[in-house]
A protein has these predicted regions:
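Anion-binding (especially nucleotide phosphate/pyrophosphate-binding) glycine-rich loop
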Residues: 2-9, 13-14, 44-152
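ATP-dependent small-molecule kinase catalytic core of the GHMP/sugar-kinase superfamily
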Residues: 2-15, 22-38, 74, 134-206
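Broad gene-expression machinery/nucleic-acid interaction feature
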Residues: 18, 38, 46-48, 62, ...
Length: 206
């Protein structure tokens, strides 16, 4: 039986999400702060996700994860309990679900290193959930994508996480985030002239 990688996909879904810098007010977006205000900016390099969609023909490797940063490619079996290789990716796929008639290969890549305090894990999760949402066929708002990504980290994986990283990755640009009751928050996007964007980009070194 051909593997998904050896067949022609029915469709290809591409999704990107920015990382975050300049988190003024960071840690006021957490459960222990309860309410707070954060200013941040979404910037390149993006987390990049590509999903190649195939008809499901009963193969065992129905879902294939290609984690390029780790040099790993493996089949995911959602019916088996636990998330053992890349829990964030596997839990996000479980949360979103897979239509019964589909198989897919998902490729994830980011130039931003993990652990750099730029919200890379949130960007990866937001990009992945945004791509998976297009399978069904794409009805989540940016706010809903952010909250779904946050729920994967906190409710499914029981990790500590504020809400600003996911909101920044889902909205992009310059954001003023006001959390009025964790995890509920409003996002006001700040519009600036292109000349200011270009100057910010010229001066930014990552």
């Amino acid at each position: 039986m051909n593997t998904p990688a050896q067949r022609r996909p029915l469709r290809i879904i591409n999704s990107v999400a920015p990382i975050r810098i300049c988190d003024n007010g960071g840690w006021t977006d957490t459960w222990f702060a309860e309410h707070g205000k954060v200013f941040n900016i979404g910037v390149y390099p993006y987390a990049e996700v590509q999903i190649e969609v195939f008809p499901y023909e009963g193969e065992d490797n129905r879902i294939v994860i290609n984690a390029e940063n780790y040099g790993e490619r493996y089949a995911l079996h959602p019916e088996r309990p636990g998330w053992d290789r890349h829990p964030l990716l596997e839990a996000a796929i479980e949360r979103m679900g897979v239509p019964d008639d589909m198989a897919f290969q998902v490729t994830i890549f980011s130039d931003a290193p993990a652990g750099a305090s730029t919200g890379t894990s949130a960007a990866v999760t937001v990009a992945l959930i945004g791509a998976l949402d297009c399978l069904t066929p794409g009805r989540l708002t940016p706010h809903e994508v952010a909250y779904t990504a946050h729920s994967v980290e906190t409710d499914m994986l029981h990790l500590q996480s504020g809400i600003q990283d996911q909101l920044c990755s889902a909205y992009g640009g310059i954001n003023y985030i006001e959390m009025f009751r964790f995890p509920h928050a409003s996002v006001s996007q700040i519009q600036v002239p292109n000349s200011i964007w270009w100057e910010l980009e010229r001066r930014l070194v990552l």
